[in-house]
Amino acid sequence: MEMEILYNYDTIIIGGGLSGLNTAYDLKKSNFKILVLEARNRFGGRTDSVKVGDGWVDAGGQWLGTNNPNLKQLCKELKLETYKQFYQGKTVFDIYDDGLIKSFDESSPNFDLCEIGLGNINPIIRAIKEVMKNIDFSKCSKESPIMLSLEKLTVSEWLRVCGYGESVKFFNWFCKMSVASSSDDISILFLLKYVNSINGFESLFISDDDCTESDRIIGGSSMVSERIVSYLKDDCKLNCEVTLIDQISHKNSRLIKITTSNNENYYCRNVVSTIPPMLLKNVIFKPDLPIEKQRLKNEMEMGNTIKVIVIYDSVFWRDQGYNGKSQSFVGPIYQSFDNCTNDLSVKSIIGFINGKEEIKYWYSKSLEERRSAVLNQYSKYWGPKALNPIHYIERNWSLDKYSAGCFMGVCKSGDIISQCNNYYTQPHGNIHWAGTETSTQWYGHMEGAITSSKRVVNEILKNSLNSKSKL
């Protein structure tokens, strides 16, 4: 009898980040009875906008790229405005073995890797592009010899095998900046899969109005979640960590029972899980997941990043002709960006400490030691005013229980992509899968999260039409 009373949802979505909330948003517009269960005490997942005075800073994901149609359309629908990331002026390059620090204008028509002394990278990129032409990333196959061979090598190993050992330092930096993992911690196949999902290398190397970090949302990226939550109203709940998903037979159909850590039970016909792969190990599934999905949850890892936000009382770097962007092989900040709000109510620079070993090293230091190292690095680039911020903020995403890191799930060398990747989005009974890690487009980005939600909504709508099972 209890089952009859509680069986009142078409679909329950686990996770109140961008993919989960947009899944709920689209299903509710189609008159589905839905519920979002979020484990945290806030919505937004790996986006988190923090109020600072009259403005904000984004402690999590914050950028839209030019080729992010789904996210841009959603912002338009939610009446959210965007503004351009500030790139006018010189970028600092701290990448030279002799310790010299140079600056270049990336908007110059003549700017390229050769100008900054990295011309030796161009042949490697061309070689990688040739390799990518022979891979069908839409069908990661255990029958593909090239995929199997590439996946057995880390990025560093592949470079050395191919005779590009002198470029390991650059690609180690590149991997940290793009997927928050070192070139020793991910397979070359995973890196190529990621690069393919964002339409190639070019937009990662040079920052301009067409790059992957071209636009920001006024009010912060969390505004997307806030607007959707205001639409969903009581159809989303916080502090509901899911511990059990049990598919049971009921009246000749499959009923799903969801149990949370506070012993609440919910019943529905469909579940959408947006939990990152490596966190699925915290949930009991009945019946158990197929072996391929079990391998994904047990073997995938999350990238590691500390996002550092330094707030100042002036935009002194702009006044000196700099754009706040830096690229460093030295650290502790390996990449930084101007992080000012559109109205300059908050004047700040964000920086990233990325990679497993880097996080381990810098988090063994005190907060004051990290702060001092970051400010001293910035003072080398933009002068003594960098030593006197009005606020210093850190977010170590590796310490976040419900993210376990950032920016995205990554794959080490082995065979997990070629053996298991095609299984990740396949429904398990009436359990469907979304989240940026399930997206073949803009993997790891906010756009990837929205794209995955579009896919899973189409799955559920199609199933509903076939079975006429909507409540």
Swiss-Prot record:
Reported cofactor(s): FAD
Keywords, alphabetical: FAD, Flavoprotein, Oxidoreductase
Matching Pfam families: Amino_oxidase
Keyword Metal-binding set for record: no
Top-level class of the enzyme under EC nomenclature: oxidoreductase
Superkingdom: Eukaryota
Oxidoreductase in keyword set: yes
In-chain residues carrying the UniProt-annotated modification S-8alpha-FAD cysteine: 406
Gene3D superfamilies: FAD/NAD(P)-binding domain
EC number: 1.4.3.4
Entry's family note: Belongs to the flavin monoamine oxidase family.
Protein name, as recorded: Probable flavin-containing monoamine oxidase B
Encoding gene per record: maoB-1
